[in-house]
C-alpha cells in the first residue's frame, strides 16, 4: 500500500491525512507513560499512530483518540479497526473543546500544532494540522485540566518556545513539570524539541537528553532502544 507505514504489530494507512507520521509523533508514543495507566486520551490523533503505540505499550488500557479533521478521523478509525488491539481503541471526530467525556484520564498525550500566529499554510487542512493561534494552547490546557485525574499525567511534544508557553500557562491549573526530555538531532546540535510531562505532584522535574543520530545515517543506541518494539528496522 503506497501510503502505508508498517510497524511491528500494526500498520498505519496515511491516506487523506494532512500530517503524516513523523519523528515527533513516534517519540511521544514511545516515551509518554504512567504506571498502570487504565484510561488514555490522545488529543489530535491524526493517523492514530500515537494512540496505537500506547495501546501496544499498555495492554490493559482503554485508549480514546480525538481528531478535529473528518478525513483524518476516518483514516485513524480504519487504522484502529485493523490493529490487533482494536477492541481497546476508540476514535472520535470532535474538536477538543466539544469533547466532554464522562470519565477522567490518567494519561493524556498530544502532539499539537505549533506555528503560533505564523503564516497560515495555503492548504487549509495542512494549516489546521500544523498551525494554531494564541488561544489554542489555552483551550487545550483548560480541557486537559478538566479531564486529567488528580494523579494523572499530561505529555506533549513541542519546540522549545511553545513548550515553555504551555508550561507557563499550566501553572494556573496547578500543573507543573514532572519530566522533560530534551531532544537533539545529535550531541553537537542544539535542542530542537521537548517532550514534557505535566502533573499535579509539585515535585521537582527530572531532565534527560535524547540524541537521535550518532553519525550520518546512524541512529544512537538510546533512540533504537526507545523504538525497538515498533520499528521493523530496529
Curated annotation (Swiss-Prot):
GO terms for cellular component: cytoplasm. One of its GO terms (molecular function) is nucleic acid binding. GO terms for biological process: methylation; tRNA processing. It comes from the Bacteria. It is an enzyme of class 2 (transferase). Its main location: cytoplasm. Pfam families: MTS. The keyword rRNA-binding does not apply. The keyword Nucleus does not apply. Its EC number is 2.1.1.223. InterPro entries: DNA_methylase_N6_adenine_CS, SAM-dependent_MTases_sf, Small_mtfrase_dom, tRNA_Adenine-N(6)_MTase, tRNA_adenine-N6_MeTrfase. It is found in: Cytoplasm. SUPFAM superfamilies: S-adenosyl-L-methionine-dependent methyltransferases (SSF53335). It catalyses: adenosine(37) in tRNA1(Val) + S-adenosyl-L-methionine = N(6)-methyladenosine(37) in tRNA1(Val) + S-adenosyl-L-homocysteine + H(+). Keywords: Cytoplasm, Methyltransferase, S-adenosyl-L-methionine, Transferase, tRNA processing. Belongs to the methyltransferase superfamily. tRNA (adenine-N(6)-)-methyltransferase family. Specifically methylates the adenine in position 37 of tRNA(1)(Val) (anticodon cmo5UAC). This is tRNA1(Val) (adenine(37)-N6)-methyltransferase.
